[in-house]
Amino acid sequence: MFPMQFTNSAYRQMEPMFAPGPRGQVQPYRPRTKRRQEPQVGNAAIAALANQMSALQLQVAGLAGQARVDRRGPRRVQKSKQKKKNPSNGEKPKEKKKKQKQQEKKGSGGVIKKPRNRPGKEVRISVKRARQSTFPVYHDGAISGYAVLIGSRVFKPAHVKGKIDHPELADIKFQVAEDMDLEAAAYPKSMRDQAAEPATMMDGVYNWEYGTIRVEDNVVIDASGRGKPGDSGRAITDNSGKVVGIVLGGGPDGRRTRLSVIGFDKKMKAREIAYSEAIPWTRAPALLLLPMVIACTYNSNTFDCSKPSCQDCCITAEPKKAMAMLKDNLNDPNYWDLLIAVTTCNSARKKRAVSTSPAAVYDTQILAAHAAASPYRAYCPDCDGTACISPIAIDEVVSSGSDHVLRIRVGSQSGVTAKGGAAGETSLRYLGRDGKVHAADNTRLVVRTTAKCDVLQATGHYILASCPEGQSITVAATLDGTRHQCTTVFEHQVTEKFTRERSKGHHLSDLTKKCTRFSTTPKKSAPYLVDVYDALPISVEISTVVTCNDNQCTVKVPPGTTVKFDKKCKSAAQATVTFTSDSQTFTCEEPVLTAASITQGKPHLRSSMLPSGGKEVKARIPFPFPPETATCRVSVAPLPSITYEESDVLLAGTAKYPVLLTTRNLGFHSNATSEWIQGKYLRRIPVTPQGIELTWGNNAPLHFWSSVRYASGDADAYPWELLVHHTKHHPEYAWAFVGVACGLLVIAVCMFACACNRVRYSLVANTFNPNPPPLTALTAALCCIPGARADQPYLDIIAYLWTNSKVAFGLQCAAPVACVLIVTYALRHCRLCCKSFLGVRGWSALLVILAYVQSCKSYEHTVVVPMDPRAPSYEAVINRNGYDPLKLTIAVNFTVISPTTALEYWTCASVPIVEPPHVGCCTSVSCPSDLSTLHAFTGKAVSDVHCDVHTNVYPLLWGAAHCFCSTENTQVSAVAATVSEFCAQDSERAEAFSVHSSSVTAEVLVTLGEVVTAVHVYVDGVTSARGTDLKIVAGPITTDYSPFDRKVVRIGEEVYNYDWPPYGAGRPGTFGDIQARSTNYVKPNDLYGDIGIEVLQPTNDHVHVAYTYTTSGLLRWLQDAPKPLSVTAPHGCKISANPLLALDCGVGAVPMSINIPDAKFTRKLKDPKPSALKCVVDSCEYGVDYGGAATITYEGHEAGKCGIHSLTPGVPLRTSVVEVVAGANTVKTTFSSPTPEVTLEVEICSAMVTCASECTPPKEHVVATRPRHGSDTGGYISGPAMRWAGGIVGTLAVLFLILAVTYCVVKKCRSKRIRIVKS
């Protein structure tokens, strides 16, 4: 029933059952018995047996590479004639014989030879284990996908509809994932043994049903290419059988098949690795699988486009019929299928292909489709120094302008054989000088600008190459031993949009962004087809097509071409003859044959390097590299080493490639800076208290705040250290104080000098005065002035005043008496005013008011919250009399500024479009009245159209124009401006918006206890919200600030404030040189353009249109590197481009009123009434969130709850609700201090206590989160500084007083001096 494999030990245990009998002993014959009916077992038993067998298989796989010693020693050699074995053991004799031979292989000494590893067997075992946990899902009778049991759940893709084909799993209910294509459900416990173990999907190679799967850089490739609809949900396993993911779908990616999968890890966390072009591999119901009738027409007959009649379809057998069929069905939606059918010719027997994957086959069909067109030769201005008609002429070079990749169109076809079939990458199909189509292998195709380019891919006429910047481009190839090259002028300049890293290497990150690139995956849609027109004749030497022997001439016509030349015989006039058959002969006497040309039978692309040809589209061939919007991976530079020094952030490291460093302040003035850094670097960035945002490359922004101002010195030390500290902490206050003190000191010194001078003269006068003034007595009287101490008791002060100063005593007592009189006067007048309320009506009104107060059902809490999501949350403890406290937290979740915008126009890269020159040979031509009818302009939106007629061109030119007149030749040159083909991609298009008013919205989270309520507030009104028994009234927001100006520009994922020109006022080379408002980005019907086109007179060396124009204004604007709002927006706003929003701007505030019902409060039975509060600060570090620790002890009279919070502004305390017990209580809490000295008032219930302490400086002055404590505005002066300043001011004041008294005394004495007259 199950395949059985055993290890060596298991085989030895069962050896008596299989070993032969003793030598010479004949085994008794046992007749063949009928196999008895095996008992029916349940699903659980089957699952248990299957798991046991799987375990044995894994043991065999694990022991495959190990050698074991046979303990039984050497076994005897078996005879060549094998005995009949009893087949009752359920094993075939041949299989058993094979196993015995494997067991008998030994080396010398009885050691078994080491067998070789068998990784293929391990893979088969792992796939087999995955099958046991995989169940098909049926929908309308067909398998639509699969479900897999992994771990404790069953998984299947969400797009797989139907029921699981298992009785226990058919009716389970799945839960759909929100962000990925996955469903999961719990399965019955009885099936736990069948579940596979999960493993983590990493880069590497894994197994699935059809072969191997390679995972690399979030790209999953199916190496087998055999995935198909109906395989969605199949398991992806590693070699041990553990499931790492399930398949969702797939699609072609060039020549590969790329998958979309769901990957798991060991913890069963799922992630989706999606491919944008993948198709879900679910099988539709049988009813939808009916073949659709896809009708193409030919000769009024309808047929399936993918299966035309092979007698008429093959382009190699019947080229005229095939081309006519393609022409008749150009507008059919299934033209692509018809093109593949007529060029691949499915009826013919083909060689066995090397690769059978759908992507490889599809790529081969794309190359073979070029059989519907022919290569061509065109003018090249520089063929190694001279102009020529080249088979690899460069006809078109296209660049997005934002990267180095170029798309080059040449006249030859890459990857195509001479007959138009698919060939190797080095093959090149070209048109030779003889007018025949050739193919060359090993062409050594080279593309070069200033250096050699990397050729990424070459398909048909188009080459995709990554080139360095330059002013010209060269394409070179070796064709049949001859080296050809063509150089043309093309300014290749990369103008990158705003980017943060310039990495050219492999990206190891998972970060992606939208980008524009050339698609390398052909698709069956109109943008992937290009028109071809009638082939133009090329001039050839007459000897290549006509060979004459006397009068007999033979024309050699290459297959599928037309030969045309001028013939003049002796007896006939000159005539133009045409030949279309393979070979023809004519007779002409003295033939003069000139102007030979060959025209290909199949059409080719229109070229501006050739004259204008036919206007009718003959067919369409694949256009391999149209632009598309894709998801590109970007690099993420390693973060630098970040250290803090004083109030600065230091960045140090080494950047291997240029990385952009941007900074901005989070306040009103952003002061944005940006700098490209490469190599070793060390940058110092100052940090402000408002905060700073630092963005390194493509990493997430980092935010830093200055917790306190950095200052050296010590705030609690000697005067010189105090001076150093305060001059750095608050230099304006410190130096002002020093200046005032020095000024006062100078004045005091001057006064002291003057007083000393006066005293000297007074002493001299006293010496000669017999009655000197009472100077000594007056000076002594100053010392008798009574003093008073502020700490004396109040009654002692009153007694002193009564004794020494009756007036002062009266004034001291007058103040309280006056207060009593004022209060009495107010009460008396209040009684007169309220006399009517003292009766029955007054008492009734009083009772009603008291009843209303008692029936109040809610408690109102009001607060104003700053609108900054980066700010710390607001925390408070609600203390309501008679109730236990409640903790309230309010936090701003996000803010949104949404402007009202109007799209004025969009602009993109402008390109000129050139009509091939219309040459009038020996005649005159003129511009049409309606220039839009010119064939190059049809199907495209054009503006700034210029058309000029040039005379006297190409005199006697024998080239492509075929003009033989000297002066009558004229040419019409037409050039217009149009939008680039990249304009259809959102990331390459700039949109000009006018901004009107803005609406500001914020979401505030209110947490009361364990209940969280979200409230949306607005700038233009009050919001009323209800939570769980809460009523919240919030708003309006106090500001309508918006970072957007009146005019903004959006391009890609960035937004710019830019004053763009109005619609219709663009100028060449500036932003808005090409404008449109239509949503049809390929062909807008309201296109305005002015790119400075000027049509010039063509030179006579070749047929061409000469013109000049100005480079795209958008690219020039991007070259100026404007800074987007994501770098310059104030208040730390995050800018969203689509939709246009400003998020998380830290500006404004919102008032809130919260009505809390009585039901939220718990009534107190007893009031704890804390008393005898004492606070001891255990440690304190200022400038740090909750850097201080305090211990509060108190006595509780009753058991209950008390809220603890701070009453000091700017010093937050960790609010909490504490349990109070009767007796001694201790509470440990933390607080934040912005200053070196802190005095904190803490309230516990209704009791207050003061905590005071000196704090140490913080270790770091820069923090990564916004500080909770208040910012220091510059008014802080430490205690020691105040004491020293007070001492200095007091000393100076005393000195001034002494000097003033001395001056007055001396002045008085000198007024009574005597004159001393010398004899």
From Swiss-Prot:
Residue positions bearing lipid (S-stearoyl cysteine): 1309
Residue ranges, annotated region (Host transcription inhibition): 48-81
Keyword terms: Capsid protein, Cleavage on pair of basic residues, Disulfide bond, Fusion of virus membrane with host endosomal membrane, Fusion of virus membrane with host membrane, Glycoprotein, Host cell membrane, Host cytoplasm, Host endoplasmic reticulum, Host Golgi apparatus, Host membrane, Host nucleus, Host-virus interaction, Hydrolase, Ion channel, Ion transport, Lipoprotein, Membrane, Palmitate, Protease, RNA-binding, Serine protease, T=4 icosahedral capsid protein, Transmembrane, Transmembrane helix, Transport, Viral attachment to host cell, Viral attachment to host entry receptor, Viral ion channel, Viral penetration into host cytoplasm, Virion, Virus entry into host cell
Region feature (Dimerization of the capsid protein): 202-212, 238-242
Motif Nuclear localization signal: positions: 74-119
PROSITE patterns, per database record: ALPHAVIRUS_CP (PS51690)
Functions as an uncleaved signal peptide for the precursor of protein E3/E2 as annotated region, ranges: 282-301
MF terms in GO: serine-type endopeptidase activity; structural molecule activity
Region feature Transient transmembrane before p62-6K protein processing, mapped onto this chain: 759-783
InterPro entries to which the protein is assigned, alphabetical: Alpha_E1_glycop, Alpha_E2_glycop, Alpha_E3_glycop, Alphavir_E2_A, Alphavir_E2_B, Alphavir_E2_C, Flavivir/Alphavir_Ig-like_sf, Glycoprot_cen/dimer_sf
Additional notes on this entry: Structural polyprotein: Translated from a subgenomic RNA synthesized during togavirus replication.
Protein name per Swiss-Prot or TrEMBL: Structural polyprotein
Source organism of this protein record: Alphavirus salmon subtype 3
